[in-house]
A protein has these predicted regions:
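S-adenosylmethionine/decaboxylated-SAM
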Residues: 1-118
Length: 118
C-alpha cells in the first residue's frame, strides 16, 4: 500500500521546499514528495505509477481549461468514496461543469472551496 503525499508545483526562483509545502504537517513530511514541473506533464506521469488515490486537491492554475484538465486526469484514479477538492471554484465554472459531467453532487464549503465524493 502506497501512502504518499505528492505536490506538483512550478519551480519558483526564490521559493524553498518549506514555503511550497507549508501546509504539510512536519509529522507527514517524510511521506511528502514535491515534484517540480508543469502539472500537464507531471500529473499524468505521477498517476501512471499509482494504483489509486484517496484525495486529489486542485490548487494550481485557476483557469477553466487547466482546472478541467486536472479534474479529468485525476478522476479515473480516485477511489470509490475518494474525494476531489478544488480551491478557487468561484473563478470560473469548471468545478460545477465537471460535477455535472461526472454526475456527482458538489459540496460547496465556501465561495471558493468545493468537494466531490466519488
Amino acid at each position: 500500500m502506497d501512502l504518499g503525499l505528492y505536490s506538483i508545483d512550478l519551480p519558483f526562483e526564490f521559493a524553498t521546499k518549506k514555503e511550497v509545502g507549508i501546509i504539510v504537517p512536519k509529522r507527514l513530511r517524510y511521506r511528502w514528495e514535491l515534484i517540480l514541473g508543469d502539472s500537464k506533464i507531471e500529473l499524468p506521469r505521477l498517476l501512471k505509477d499509482l494504483d489509486s488515490i484517496d484525495v486529489f486537491f486542485h490548487n494550481s492554475l485557476h483557469i477553466y481549461e487547466h482546472m478541467m484538465f486536472e479534474f479529468k486526469t485525476a478522476w479515473p484514479k480516485i477511489k470509490k468514496n475518494g474525494i476531489l477538492i478544488s480551491d478557487d471554484i468561484h473563478l470560473n465554472n469548471s468545478f460545477i461543469d465537471f460535477c455535472k459531467a461526472v454526475k456527482c453532487k458538489p459540496i460547496i464549503l465556501s465561495a471558493n472551496l468545493g468537494i466531490i465524493v466519488k
